[in-house]
Amino acid sequence: MRIVPPSVFVCVLFVAGTAAADVLQVFSERQGMSGQFIQHIVTPEGELLETSEGQFSLLRPHFVRWQIESPDQQLLIVNENTLTQIDWDLEVVSTRAMTPENRSALDWLMAPARELEQTFDISSSSRQATLIPREQISAFERLEIEFEATSLRWELSLTDSAGQILTVTLTEDPDVMPTRSDFDPPPTDFE
């Protein structure tokens, strides 16, 4: 299994809404969401490296829960400025600060419109947005977001500097709105 930095998982998570407005505008108005995800990591040549799936929850301003259920069991939680990663298969818990230096695509998407416009070349419509950094940033070289309103499904495609592509399908459950307590790391029998 290829290990992908937790910041990559975190960086593609917090996007949802309705197709009535510009995708990034919809994003900026969104307070939270929960649902299921399927994630694929693909080489620049198109070879599938890994597929995983699980549950996610997102809550503004800085809360993310990314629970990988298959093929391994991992939990990534961003609670304000702290990232906690729990790997039940390896029985490991790690914690690190989320700082401006390791700013993820998620942080960029949550930025004010003026900051996005200064940092990225953006093309956007009611269904799709593409963000390309004007200068090198660590998280990605290209982020594409597409929304399927009828199925409440979001397709995210993040291309890194090596040309590797992380695609994530988020299927929103409109009946489940996360609460602040969903982002407290659970206790474990290991540290």
Language-model features, listed with the residues they occupy:
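Bacterial N-terminal signal peptides that target proteins for export
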Residues: 1-9
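Extracytoplasmic
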Residues: 30-32, 51-53, 61, 71, ...
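Short, well-ordered turn and helix-capping elements at secondary-structure junctions
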Residues: 39-43, 60-62, 70-72, 133-135, ...
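N-terminal signal peptide c-region/cleavage motif recognized by signal peptidases
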Residues: 15-18
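An acidic-aromatic
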Residues: 55-105, 166-167
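One face of beta-strands
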Residues: 33-39, 52-56, 64-66, 156
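Flexible, processing/modification-adjacent segments and terminal tails
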Residues: 22-43, 47-49, 86-141
